[in-house]
Regions:
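A signal for specific C-terminal beta-sheet/loop modules enriched in small/flexible residues
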Residues: 1-2, 17-19, 103-105
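Intrinsically disordered, low-complexity segments enriched in polar/charged small residues
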Residues: 12-13, 55
């Protein structure tokens, strides 16, 4: 579970039944996706905006013959909160405590979740105050000094999360709490990478938040980590959305396939929800293929207080059932395939209902748009 350290300034740090991210456990295939601010509604709710979903066979310490190390494990990473600037203080990028974030696994091919790993976040506000003259005054920052350990005393707000495994339907299935090996059912999340004066060794600090856990009903131990990581989606979004504002020769040059332009998003961060689970705990019977996707859901209603009390994140109350507002499985489906009128609908939908979006796949508009802005001839399909 090694991931790039979050960046700081000047530091390198199913449109069908299978349109969920598909990963074969018998073959070395990987599933990945990407979606940043892709729909009108989610663009206004960055804390629940899923940006990427990765699912692949773990390779840490695995020999060429497929043995040793983490062989037999599957890594799942759901990224949220796109385009985080390293200097985005003083509050940085905490997760939405009123939302639930989920990774779903379909292990029988019916485009419905059979397993759901649900993350729920909370903020422990310490209200750190310091004496100023003859009064004690609350500080305005996330931290009151250097930070080096989980739930550091200098953290004014300590972000925590719970992890629940749900077997069957995500709302009506059987729920099992995943416990912290140190006791209880709550895990600490590392504060974002504020900078090297606050956190001298961010990689070492974050590594203290990798937990080895027991998944209920699973004989093999798993690992979980939630925290800020460097953006891994290497696409120059500015150029792409500006009518592909680059020479065709550059775009099609295989020698430049790994080139990162100056205004790419690799200087941004995301928040990763990472799980590493043994394949025997994800599959069903003799089936060796699983599908996976991630969603975020919020309460149906939110009521803002015109005169909020003192406290942390207490300006509103929420209620009602959870409503799905973000969904991500296959790469770029909602971003570049689904039409603008249906992007919010897609984010609220489930894989088993994807037939309603079939026209966007059978009659795609993106090739025609590319033909209109690039001198590459007729790229649009004609065998419709």
């Amino acid at each position: 579970m090694n991931h790039p350290t979050p960046r700081r300034p000047l530091l390198v740090t199913t449109l069908t039944a299978v349109c969920a991210a598909i990963a074969s456990l018998a073959l070395p295939l990987a599933a990945h996706a990407s979606s940043h601010r892709e729909a009108p509604s989610i663009a206004g709710s960055p804390r629940v905006d899923g940006t990427d979903f990765y699912m692949f066979k773990s390779y840490e310490g695995v020999a060429a013959d497929g043995t040793g190390g983490r062989a037999g494990y599957v890594t799942m990473i759901a990224n949220y909160q796109p385009l985080q600037d390293p200097y985005g203080g003083p509050n940085y990028f905490k997760m939405d405590s009123n939302a639930i974030y989920e990774i779903h696994i379909d292990n029988n091919g019916d485009a419905k979740e059979d397993l759901t790993f649900q993350f729920k976040f909370s903020n422990a506000f310490k209200a750190i105050s310091i004496p100023i003259g003859n009064v004690t005054v609350p500080i305005p920052l996330t931290q009151a000094g250097t930070v080096s350990v989980p739930n550091d005393p200098n953290l004014n707000v300590n972000e925590k999360f719970t992890l629940t495994l749900i077997r069957g339907d995500r709302r009506t299935g059987n729920a099992f709490v995943v416990n912290n090996p140190s006791g209880g059912a709550v895990f600490d999340k590392p504060v974002d990478n504020i900078g090297n004066k606050t956190i001298a060794d961010y990689a070492g600090y974050a590594a203290q938040h990798v937990y080895t856990v027991a998944i209920p009903g699973c004989a093999m131990p798993a690992r979980v980590f939630v925290g800020q990581r460097q953006e891994a989606f290497a696409v120059n979004l500015g150029v792409i959305f500006d009518l592909v504002n680059a020479p065709v020769g550059v775009i099609t040059d295989r020698n430049l396939i790994n080139a990162a332009a100056a205004n790419s998003i690799q200087d941004k961060n995301v928040t990763s929800l990472a799980l590493e689970v043994h394949q025997s705990c994800l599959t069903q019977g003799s089936e060796t293929v699983i599908g996976g996707w991630t969603t975020a859901s919020v309460r149906q209603s939110q009521l803002f207080n015109p005169n909020p009390p003192s406290g942390y994140d207490v300006s509103s109350r929420v209620g009602g059932n959870y409503v799905q507002v973000s969904r991500l499985g296959m790469p770029l489906v909602n971003e570049l395939v689904i039409g603008l009128p249906d992007k919010d609908k897609f984010n609220a939908s489930v894989p088993s209902g994807d037939a309603q979006f079939a026209t966007y796949v059978t009659n795609p508009t993106l090739p025609a748009l590319l033909s209109a802005v690039l001198p590459i001839g007729n790229a649009a399909p004609t065998n419709l």
